[in-house]
């Protein structure tokens, strides 16, 4: 988005990650980061306040999430609550805070970065998939409500995307199965029709499009970025 002229404000829990990404200067727009924990209500509200102190928001990308793999029967209420706060309530709070100014200006974009797990349930990711399905539902509901105000709200459902999170997951699987992380990633990629994992840049390209005026009639959709892995009509 910065490459296309947007002034970007983001947050992350890791101060080093915030510092590294904030140093990006190749785009036409600025990039600034704030250390915040989207799984904590007060931290999220402080982040929102900091952002609004710099002016209104035209584009909101709800891109937060953790996807622990765990057994449903051994999960406690706290496990569900913590992931619900991080994955879903962060999007609820940010959307609620930034939407009014978009409505007033009669222009805005909100994107829910959900997951293919929100549409195709996986028992090992039951809590993650539940929160991501809720994001899709919220996006669809709000799109129907606020589309007439010029605010377009859509969801993006990434499939297998080669990220640091997947690197860690592959490492855990490799350790448990006696393989290397590279072998795990390669084997998983074979299950995708294009034969590989996707990249963050390929997801970002869709984000840029949906935030542009070229997507002025796209509202309430849930678009999969999965290399053709989904088999439904």
Residue ranges and their predicted role:
Residues 100, 144-145, 216:
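Alpha-helical segment proximal to the catalytic Tyr-Lys
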């Amino acid at each position: 988005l910065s490459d296309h002229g947007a002034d970007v404000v983001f947050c992350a829990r890791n101060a080093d990650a915030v510092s590294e990404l904030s140093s990006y200067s190749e785009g036409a727009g600025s990039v600034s980061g704030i250390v915040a924990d989207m799984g904590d209500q007060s931290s999220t509200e402080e982040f929102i306040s900091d952002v609004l102190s710099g002016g209104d928001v035209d584009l909101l990308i709800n891109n937060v999430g953790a996807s622990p793999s765990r057994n449903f029967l051994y999960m406690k209420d706290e496990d569900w609550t913590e992931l619900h706060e991080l994955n879903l309530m962060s999007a609820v709070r940010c959307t609620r805070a930034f939407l009014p100014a978009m409505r007033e200006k009669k222009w805005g974009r909100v994107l829910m970065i959900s997951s293919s797990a929100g549409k195709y349930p996986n028992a090992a990711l039951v809590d993650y998939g539940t929160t991501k399905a809720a994001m899709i539902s919220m996006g669809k509901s709000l799109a129907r409500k606020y589309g007439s105000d010029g605010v377009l709200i859509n969801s993006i459902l990434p499939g297998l995307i080669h990220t640091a999170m997947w690197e860690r997951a592959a490492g855990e699987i490799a350790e448990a199965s006696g393989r290397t992380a590279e072998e795990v990633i390669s084997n998983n990629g074979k299950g995708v029709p294009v034969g590989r994992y996707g990249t963050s840049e390929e997801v970002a390209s869709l984000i840029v499009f949906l935030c542009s005026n070229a997507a002025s009639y796209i509202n309430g959709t849930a678009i999969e970025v999965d290399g053709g892995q989904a088999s439904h009509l």
